[in-house]
């Protein structure tokens, strides 16, 4: 009986000795392996969210502004539902609106000042009207800060100080200090937006000849104003043109009558 007990104890000790490397590997796996990224990471470009061993958890930093359509808007809603404490900034703008062009530049700067907030922007023509109605968008630009419990719309002035205070009041976060790399990246984005503005201004003279349907859809006010000016011009010119035509026919009629009288 004692021999059997000793044999069982020896077998248990050998098994424990063989399992020690596996247990050690399992203990270190939580620190040395990065977790699998969620599906939203395919839409939101992030920096590495795998912390070093012994470091506390921190919020992921989102790089830049994600431009998208209805599908990306749905991804933003999914991100809010997955991270209930995190905020998402959503900007609705219109390419024909000059205020939207200025606001886009400030929105890009805000994404650098508040990197822990995911920033999404949506152009009017890429979003279905029912989605704009769902969010109550009646003018451009329109900015929201959204999380799982609230949706706050910005109503203040379009200055950076006012926007930063709005972010701080709603989220409780302070703007971060930017390093040289972040400033350089932000400057590059601002230059790209400025170049786009110059290109749009250069092409605006040929917009009507190139695509009048697009002009009517995106620049409705400009199209109506142009139509009004043309109608007023026609109302001014048509009476004078009619009088000139009548005078020409009258002169031709008198000339023909004189020729007939000479022949007779």
From Swiss-Prot:
Glycosylated residues (UniProt): 147
Domain Thioredoxin: 51-172
Keyword Lipoprotein: no
Topology of the protein relative to the lipid bilayer: Single-pass membrane protein
Membrane-crossing segments per the record: 221-241
Signal peptide: 1-29
Entry keyword set: Glycoprotein, Membrane, Signal, Transmembrane, Transmembrane helix
Location within or outside the cell: Membrane
Major localization listed first in the record, in broad terms: membrane
Keyword Transmembrane helix: yes
Protein name, as recorded: 5'-adenylylsulfate reductase-like 4
Primary gene name: APRL4
